[in-house]
Amino acid sequence: MAFEVIPAVDMRGGKCVQLVQGVPGSEIVSLNDPLAVALDWIGKGAKTLHLVDLDGAIEGERKNAPIIEKIVQACREKGVSIQVGGGIRSFEDAASLLELGVSRIILGTAALQNPELVKQLSDAFGSSCVNVALDAKNGKISIKGWTEECAQTPVEMGREFEELGAGSLLFTNIDTEGLMQGVNPGPTRELVESVSIPVIASGGVSSLEDLKVLKQTGASGVVVGSALYTGRFTLEAAIETIRND
């Protein structure tokens, strides 16, 4: 499987934003038209987009659903995969997105609070449609928009969700997220080596070199947000770097 660079389109209050370490009000980027942003990434070569409804993740209300629907439609028309997370709390929430044409739904808090949901969705739609987000802070899992910490480690949870039917994992290192100070590949590598399903990395990418470092962990791809939006590097350069690595 080729390592993939996946642009993030994070939405809050109808805008495309980038937060520092997930903290509301810490926007370093705020753009008015998420659909235009998504189309721009597709035009620059993205094969997959990563959509997050931050209002859904933080407040449990999926306020950005109408915009997400438009972006999903655009992706389908252009043959681009799309993974969506944030505020997916129930089987019905997930099913409505998958029926809309979303390639993969990302379960965070809901999976950790109700692991059986992963099995139900995997049985109904196939494991490839189900991704579980493991967000780690100080080596422990964090939930509810990074506001609560759990006792379990990413490796423990990753193995459990693989058994329940998750087809992939999204691993975010909150310690480096949004800071653009570089990645810490150790925790990602540890998780990759502990499970047999693909692991997508996220958090802290600030340079093209970081992409190479994460590729070497065995991760299947990386979600990139702040570095692209603030011009640290272009998506075209990122795709080229990975192709030549």
UniProtKB/Swiss-Prot annotation:
UniProt xrefs under InterPro entries? Aldolase_TIM, His_biosynth, HisA_bact_arch, Isoase_HisA-like, Isoase_HisA-like_bact, RibuloseP-bd_barrel
Instruction: List UniProt keywords, sorted A-Z.
Output: Amino-acid biosynthesis, Cytoplasm, Histidine biosynthesis, Isomerase
Q: Which reaction does it catalyse?
A: 1-(5-phospho-beta-D-ribosyl)-5-[(5-phospho-beta-D-ribosylamino)methylideneamino]imidazole-4-carboxamide = 5-[(5-phospho-1-deoxy-D-ribulos-1-ylimino)methylamino]-1-(5-phospho-beta-D-ribosyl)imidazole-4-carboxamide
Q: What is its main location?
A: cytoplasm
Carries keyword Glycosyltransferase? no
Q: What Gene Ontology terms describe what this protein does at the molecular function level? A: 1-(5-phosphoribosyl)-5-[(5-phosphoribosylamino)methylideneamino]imidazole-4-carboxamide isomerase activity
SUPFAM superfamilies named among the record's database cross-references: Ribulose-phoshate binding barrel
Which residues catalyse the reaction?
D10 (proton acceptor), D135 (proton donor)
Q: Pathway, according to UniProt?
A: Amino-acid biosynthesis; L-histidine biosynthesis; L-histidine from 5-phospho-alpha-D-ribose 1-diphosphate: step 4/9
This entry carries the following GO cellular component terms, namely: cytoplasm
> Would I find Amino-acid biosynthesis among this entry's keywords?
yes
- CDD domains according to UniProt: HisA
Its localization reads: Cytoplasm
Any single GO BP term = L-histidine biosynthetic process
This entry's Enzyme Commission designation comes to 5.3.1.16
Membership in a protein family: Belongs to the HisA/HisF family.
Protein name per the record: 1-(5-phosphoribosyl)-5-[(5-phosphoribosylamino)methylideneamino] imidazole-4-carboxamide isomerase
The species this protein belongs to is Methanosarcina acetivorans (strain ATCC 35395 / DSM 2834 / JCM 12185 / C2A)
What taxonomic classification does the UniProt entry list for its organism? Answer: Archaea, Methanobacteriati, Methanobacteriota, Stenosarchaea group, Methanomicrobia
